[in-house]
C-alpha cells in the first residue's frame, strides 16, 4: 500500500494504529493552522528575491536571467492568488496530519537545506523519503501529462 492508499483507508474506516496519539495529532494540526494564519496576517518581512533558491532549480536560464535582472514590470498579486497560496498551505498541513493519523512518520518539516551554496526548505520527509507536497487544479495537472 502507498501513503495515498493508507490515507483513503483511514478516511474510510476512521481507525488508527494504537501507536497514534489522536488528540496530540489533532492539537499539532490545530497549532500548525494557527501558525499559518499568524504568518499570513502578520506584517510581511521583506524577502531578498535576488538570491537563487532551491525552488528555482530547473527553471529555464532565460526566465532566471529576466527574474534577477528585473526586466519585467512586476504585477501586483491579486486577492484570489493569495487565497490560492493559503489553500495550498492548508492542504499541506491537512495531508501531513492525515499521514500521521495513518501511521506514517513525518520528519524534517520545513528543514533548511543547502546544495552548493543555494539555500531552500524541504517540505518534509515521509517515512524517510524527501517529499514535496503540492496542490494543483485539473489544468495544472494536465501540463504534466
Regions found by a protein language model. Give the residues of each.
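Metal-dependent nuclease catalytic cores that hydrolyze phosphodiester bonds in DNA/RNA
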Residues: 1-130, 137-144
Amino acid at each position: 500500500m502507498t501513503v495515498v492508499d493508507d490515507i483513503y483507508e483511514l478516511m474510510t474506516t476512521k481507525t488508527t494504529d494504537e501507536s497514534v496519539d489522536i488528540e496530540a495529532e489533532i492539537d499539532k494540526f490545530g497549532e500548525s493552522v494557527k501558525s499559518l494564519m499568524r504568518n499570513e496576517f502578520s506584517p510581511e518581512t521583506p524577502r531578498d528575491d535576488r538570491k537563487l533558491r532551491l525552488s528555482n532549480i530547473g527553471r529555464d536560464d532565460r526566465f532566471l536571467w529576466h527574474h534577477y535582472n528585473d526586466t519585467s514590470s512586476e504585477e501586483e498579486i491579486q486577492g484570489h492568488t493569495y487565497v490560492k497560496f493559503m489553500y495550498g498551505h492548508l492542504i499541506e498541513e491537512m495531508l501531513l496530519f492525515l499521514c500521521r493519523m495513518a501511521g506514517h512518520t513525518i520528519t524534517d518539516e520545513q528543514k533548511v537545506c543547502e546544495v552548493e551554496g543555494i539555500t531552500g526548505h524541504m517540505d518534509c520527509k515521509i517515512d524517510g523519503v524527501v517529499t514535496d507536497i503540492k496542490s494543483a487544479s485539473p489544468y495544472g495537472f494536465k501540463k504534466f501529462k
